[in-house]
Structure formats: C-alpha cells, structure tokens
Amino acid sequence: MLKRGRGRPGKRRRRVSIETSTCFRPACVKLGAGAGANLRQLASSRRPLRSWWVLYTIIMAAAGAPDGMEEPGMDTEAEAVATEAPARPLNCVEAEAAVGAAAEDSCDARGNLQPAPAQPPGDPAAQASVSNGEDAGGGVGKELVDLKIIWNKTKHDVKVPLDSTGSELKQKIHSITGLPPAMQKVMYKGLVPEDKTLREIKVTSGAKIMVVGSTINDVLAVNTPKDAAQQDAKAEENKKEPLCRQKQHRKVLDKGKPEDVMPSVKGAQERLPTVPLSGMYNKSGGKVRLTFKLEQDQLWIGTKERTEKLPMGSIKNVVSEPIEGHEDYHMMAFQLGPTEASYYWVYWVPTQYVDAIKDTVLGKWQYF
C-alpha cells in the first residue's frame, strides 16, 4: 500500500522525486499494460488527487521515463522562482577575483588617457588664460593729485601720481603741450627739481604748475642767425674788452659794493631764495631788487621810485659777466627790447644765483 505524504492538508506537492518513482518500478512492471488500459478509468474515478498523481508517476516510470523528468507545468514555475530569487553572495575567493579584475580595468582606463598637448607660447588661447591684472599697474593703487598745468595762457587739468618725479612730470607735460622736456621750465614755488617727487616738494591737490618754454621751431626762429655777418659780429664782440672796463659800467662799479649786498658763494649754484634778491645797483647807481613771481610768470624790478612788472616771455635775453677783482659777483642785463639799448643792467648779483636767474627767465634750453 502507498502511504500518504506528511505534507500539510490541502498543500499539493510540486513533484515526485526520482527515488520515489524508481522504488515502484517492480510494481509497474507487474502492472504492465493493464495499468495503461485502466488509465482512463483512473482519471474518471473519484480517488484522491494525490493518489492519482502517485499512480501516474509509477506508470510513467514503468514505461521507461528518464530519471529526473518533472511533471508538466513545473519548469515554468521553477524558472520564475529562480528569476525572483536574490543573487547568491560571493565567497572570499570570488570577491578577491572580482577586485583584481576591477583593478585591471582601472589600469587599462588610465593607460588610455593621453595628456593634453602643450600650447605653444604664442598661442592666443594660452595668452587668453593669463590674467591681465594691472599695469599696471600703471597707476592702479597709486595716490593721485589734481594739477592745473598753465602754459601759453592755457590751462590743462591733469591727474598724476603724487610720487612721480619732476622728470616724469615733464614727460606728462610734453604729452599734453608738445614741449620737449629739455625746453620746459616747470615752476611750483620755484623751479621743480627733476630728481624729487611731488610729495617731497609738498605739492597739494589743485596746485597750479607754471610752465615756461618754447617749441623747437620757436627757438630756432629766434636763435638762428640770419646770415654769416651776424655770427662775425658776435665773434668780434667776444674779442672786445670786458664789460666791467667800459666807461658806462665803470662809474657804477667804482662806487664799490652796496652796504646791504647779499653774501655770495663762489663756485656754487643754488636755487632762487623765497625772498627777493636785494642789495644791488642799477645803471644809475640806485638800489634795486628783483622779485620772481612764478605764479604770474613775471619779473618785478623794484626801485625806490617804482616797480616794473615784466612778463618773463617779453625778456629776450639775459647776459652776465663776472666783475674783475670780485669774481664771486656778476653784472647782469635783461634785454627788454630788440636792441642792446634796451638792456636793463643790474650790478653785484651773487654768483650762486646767476644760473638760477637765467633758467627761471629763459628756461634751461637757452644757449647763453
């Protein structure tokens, strides 16, 4: 007799194992064709479903069904279950092999990477990647000062760095007016030294900078001799006796030094003092003083009777000569007109101020 399985009631077994079916092979042989003939009768009988499946399995085994054959409809269900089942976790050996394979893939990927070609120095793309922070600096970050440049009765408002030198200021004026730096006379409380900064000479914002000078064409027009005869005349004048020996000058020099004459420093050159130059004689022997009004570009010649205010641009020439026996003092003349008769003579000028007077009145470009 076949024993009923121990499964829970109502739960159908999916398959019958090969071992179960082969156990009944001897019985199936005895049954033979009789069991097959009665198969239709078994299907229509009221036996339990489990018994029917057991008998079916026995008959199929007896008929020579290969071991491991499963019931119809079971493969699809098993495949669905296998598909839904989670992946089995890897053991240590498989995990180590997977890590090694990943490392090889990473090395291959790195080997395929090629460095980007270097851009040539002149490549515009390489130049575009460079930051153009300043220039600079050019004036970025420098303290600027507002100045009013006055030249030829024209005002120019400019901004320059406070730490720029007098030489750099002349270059700035040259870019504005066209005056070459060598022909500029830049004044702010006296001549502006080229080697000092605007900060050092205490230039403040809004200051007025006076510029005196002529263009190259103007200088050539004034100083170019009209003919060779004029050059010969100048050469003859140089061969004449010293001015201090001429009668018109001798009568003034014979009076001696004024009692209030300014002290002199032989062999030295100094800037003009901030006070007027005094203690000098004019051609009539009267006391005279010279005041240089740089802000107004004027020279004031003061006597006891009156003060003449002369624009510096109207002075054609300045000549000087040391006084014999007193070489630390000069006699000096300012040419106010077209001829020598218009010379205004001044005597006993301290030698250290002679060059400063010529530079202030004529500018450094003068050739005398």
Curated annotation (Swiss-Prot):
Superkingdom per UniProt: Eukaryota
Cysteine disulfide partners in this protein: none
Record InterPro entries: UBFD1 (IPR039120), Ubiquitin-like_dom (IPR000626), Ubiquitin-like_domsf (IPR029071), Ubiquitin_CS (IPR019954)
Residues covered by region (Disordered): 106-139, 231-263
One Pfam family this sequence matches: ubiquitin
SMART domains: UBQ
Residues annotated as domain Ubiquitin-like: 143-218
Biased composition (Basic and acidic residues): 233-244, 251-260
PANTHER family: UBIQUITIN DOMAIN-CONTAINING PROTEIN UBFD1 (PTHR16470:SF0)
Protein name stated in the entry: Ubiquitin domain-containing protein UBFD1
Gene: Ubfd1
